[in-house]
Amino acid sequence: MVLSHLRFLILLITLLPRASLSENLSHPNAAAAGPDLRNRPFVVVWNMPTANCQKRHNVHLDLQDFGIVENQRQRFQGQNMTIFYRNRLGNYPYISHDGREVNGGIPQLGDLASHLSLVEVQLDVLLRPGFSGVGVIDWEEWLPLWENNFGSKMEYRRLSKQLVRQERLDLSEQDVKLLAQQEFEESARMFMEETLRLVVRRRPRGFWGFYGFPSCYNKNKRKRGRCHSGTKQKNDRLSWLWAQSTALYPSIYLPQRLAGSTDAALMIRHRLLEALRVASTWRHGNSNNQAIPVLPYARLAFTHTLNFLNETDLEHTIGESVSLGAAGVVLWGEMKFAKSKKQCVLLRDYIHTVLGPFIQTLRAGASRCSLQLCYSHGRCARRRPNSGRSLSSAPVSVSHKDTDSGSSKYFQQHFRCRCYSGWTGTWCQRKMVGRGQDKS
């Protein structure tokens, strides 16, 4: 096993770009100063492969000017933000688009021990021991609940039933389906749960979770944004996943058809509320102290397009997130945002004129509310989720004093506090001592 790890490490080092290794391995024992999600009202993290804008097209995006957290040289993977796709972490079993059964194809036929061994080696190569950034696992080929694998994912059900038939010729078709479901869900759970357990154990300061979880299943236009019936029950069945997660990363991407529509805010709101419910119900390590942070994945353009969101659409996505009490957002995008100098210039201008100022205003409102309402020991969240009240709408005095009575009254009337770890009380005014006790 040691020899195989060594061989893989040598191979990986030869394949990785030299600059990437320089960042990751030059100071292997150094603690990375990732985004401080535990003690900041709202964090915006950049997860877009835009390094080529500077490297190839000499277009600088100036993300730090607007307080956006990025990796060194805007790399897609780094010490502040890293995302692992299906072929970048271990031996994830899946069926390729051309029908190949990769690493066994279905979870039941995957080699979990080999997978976990490889994950451990990859973590040691790519992330410093002190990694404290956003860590996302993006596995979308199959879903851990049997009934959610429909459409193109039905192949996982078919192969699971085929496997049972080969091993149990005596079973009826109904029993085949039941056993196939049981075996699939147990194996899917093992791959996801043990992978998460391992990365949290090896890099405990990171914020680890699976992209797209929890889901709300609310794409149906007739439901006015409400989650699909049975959503809570489905997500409750994934309690094992939430118990191992140290952050949640639901998706709040916006389709073009909802541009400028209040239905967009409703759809995003219900997704966030379900994620916040899950975060407050299952807390990592069974801690009774603090809900795990929720950082929804957002796009600065409509889904499958390069059409940027305007301020109204940003309010319906990022604005909803901060006003409902999310710890932050992760901004994601594809390579095509940096495909040419023209596109990089468009992106830079959008950041400078729309996105950046919008984020600055939101973060300022979140910080003011945290200071005035929560003694800077918590983040603010709407008292009534459907009120539509925004943290950025609080009145600001001419003198810009933090003690402005107008904004304090607004915050007290429309928001409440979600305390950071170690603090308690209605306004997060009491420091906790020991486990679950507070110091009055």
Language model features with spans:
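Non-catalytic scaffold segments within catalytic domains of secreted glycoside hydrolases
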Residues: 210-239, 255-261, 266, 303-326
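Alpha-helical scaffolding within the catalytic cores
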Residues: 67-69, 119-122, 226-239, 270-281, ...
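Glycoside hydrolase catalytic-domain groove-lining segments
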Residues: 237, 243, 252-301
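Aromatic- and acid-rich polysaccharide-binding/catalytic face
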Residues: 79-94, 141, 146-149, 153-179, ...
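Extracellular cysteine-rich, disulfide-stabilized repeat modules
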Residues: 380, 409, 413-422
